Amino acid sequence: MSRVVAADDNMALPFFSPEFGNVSGASSSPTTFAQLLQNVDDSTRRSHHQHHVDVDLASPDQSVPFVLSFTDLTYSVKVRRKFTWRRSVSSDPGAPSEGIFSSKTKTLLNGITGEARDGEILAVLGASGSGKSTLIDALANRIAKGSLKGNVTLNGEVLNSKMQKAISAYVMQDDLLFPMLTVEETLMFAAEFRLPRSLSKSKKSLRVQALIDQLGLRNAANTVIGDEGHRGISGGERRRVSIGIDIIHDPILLFLDEPTSGLDSTSALSVIKVLKRIAQSGSMVIMTLHQPSYRLLRLLDRLLFLSRGQTVFSGSPAMLPRFFAEFGHPIPEHENRTEFALDLIRELEGSAGGTRSLVEFNKGFRQRKAEPRSQTGLSLKEAISASISKGKLVSGATTTTHSSGSSPVSTIPTFANPFWVELAVLAKRSMTNSRRQPELFGIRLGAVLVTGFILATMFWQLDNSPKGVQERLGCFAFAMSTTFYTCADALPVFLQERFIFMRETAYNAYRRSSYVLSHSLVALPSLIILSLAFAAITFWGVGLDGGLMGFLFYFLVILASFWAGSSFVTFLSGVVPHVMLGYTIVVAILAYFLLFSGFFINRDRIPGYWIWFHYISLVKYPYEAVLLNEFGDPTKCFVRGVQIFDNTPLVAVPQGMKVRLLATMSKSLGMRITSSTCLTTGYDILQQQGVTDLTKWNCLWVTVAWGFFFRILFYFSLLLGSKNKRR
């Protein structure tokens, strides 16, 4: 099965390979992205037949402008455990057990100290549960203030949250990408979000093309990401795309959680080589690894081994043999150093004393072999400004020079782009991804058409009789509830996008308000099509009254119902953890809305302690709106003469007998009632149904308002539920 390649009207730039290092092996400074863009610009003017330039992975000698130091990091959480009453109180071993819960403090990090430098890769290693991911979260400011003890500084200064989001990136373990976007489109959208507004579209495109070559994704540039139903790029390529999204703005700090997880050895090596290039371009790479191979080990600059939240080794890979030799467990020749170290750590963890001896030995070893503390000579702001002025594309950063001629000052806004730019880019991305999955909208449209066809044929051309009135009420109730149930199909959409949203907003790629508004705008065209199709089939098929104006209002009510239902489901998708629970909640609540809408039981007969549910029912207002639209004409008659007996046991009486009964009733009441006398108008039906409080337009506006209300709740659910921080 061949890969899915998205059609692109724009011609891709010719193949090029920016030179990341000196090919001859001579020492040189790492290439900044300003030089990278220049290389890209030059390469587009050269012949596309030039040969690819391999990257020299040797670490060049250079000064260290950035040093991330962490001192005595300690982090504990409370864990609930079951406490057995019989074992603690009763001396009778046969006594029944009564379990209660108590909390226990578990230390995930215990006095972790170390440092990382730009131009280098720091790898955190250890067995599962050793605290690797927790340490990365601590360094990336993903643990809530007050929970983490210790200090994390960059160039000796504590990073505030805004600054850290601008100069850092965090690559999650899972590859969360839009499946129907190509590799190039995915990176281009990331560039639109993260790169400074001062960069032109062409410069951003050049940055993307340079990054595609840096990541080794040139052959997959026009291939869609893919998912279970669409074949796309490989697992290793997906991982590199995920990395590319987070380094598009050239972060100074790059954190990665298990970047080689689930990859074969070749793909893993390719990913680490990419990270090495990123480090050599002037970034600081800090990542967790489970068990690196010998080939991966050669690319790492610093190692930090953890065991149950404590440091058991910290230093360069070259120090491993000497460290374990002095500890009394020399590494055998030709054996993988990291595998030996991890095996020994696991063996010690299973012993009576645990890894305490190794932890204490590491403290002494570090004191004896302590390196001099790195001094940058620059404050944090000066270092960042210097880095930006040399070509770093820190998210949204701009450099300005004072009129006095002093050194340039870099300004880093909270967001790289204004609100309207974010809105346009988000809408374009969502529409592009949706347009390539027409089956999703096709299924919803098909369901609406089938439901409308069934309603139209079941209630075909209803007459103005008591029976027709009852059938209209049932048709309206089912039609309004259908619009809400159809919206439940959209529940998985945001649940699939939620982690992408959380990753992007964690580092201020865009505002949450931009996402909510774009999400609403993109949904409107499909809702209009669904509403028009459903309204046209049911209105003319059932034979509803009102003519063209009645149809237009009926269409607006259907559209408002779809809008309110879509907003309600969107809000739920922001708070429920998974799809099945979401479906259960949606179906249950919509059933309650229908029950209290006024169709099954009139408002006047609803118990007082449940009347509040009647007024918050989403089905109530569109249901009453269509009733008012259909029965609002006071001159329209629905029960004439002998039709008064249609809903009674007398319906089976012969017509002549009904006429005589009607004459007898006329004499008794002292009024003339004939077979043509109107006994029930549309207004009478509205009175019987208890629909007298609001006009039809007010019912429409209330339905629309419910939609906006749930969109606002959706915004706050994103605001409160996407902090991405441990407690």
Curated annotation (Swiss-Prot):
Residue span, ABC transmembrane type-2 domain: 421-631
Membrane association type: Multi-pass membrane protein
InterPro entries tied to this protein: AAA+_ATPase, ABC2_TM, ABC_transporter-like_ATP-bd, ABC_transporter-like_CS, ABCG_dom, ABCG_transporters, P-loop_NTPase
Any Gene Ontology CC annotation: membrane
One Gene Ontology molecular-function label: ABC-type transporter activity
Any one Gene Ontology BP term: suberin biosynthetic process
Keyword Transmembrane: yes
Domain ABC transporter, first and last residues per copy: 68-333
Alphabetized UniProt keyword annotations: ATP-binding, Membrane, Nucleotide-binding, Transmembrane, Transmembrane helix, Transport
PROSITE patterns (UniProt xref): ABC_TRANSPORTER_1, ABC_TRANSPORTER_2
Family, as annotated: Belongs to the ABC transporter superfamily. ABCG family. Eye pigment precursor importer (TC 3.A.1.204) subfamily.
Protein name: ABC transporter G family member 6
Organism of origin: Arabidopsis thaliana
Lineage: Eukaryota, Viridiplantae, Streptophyta, Embryophyta, Tracheophyta
Gene, per the UniProt record: ABCG6
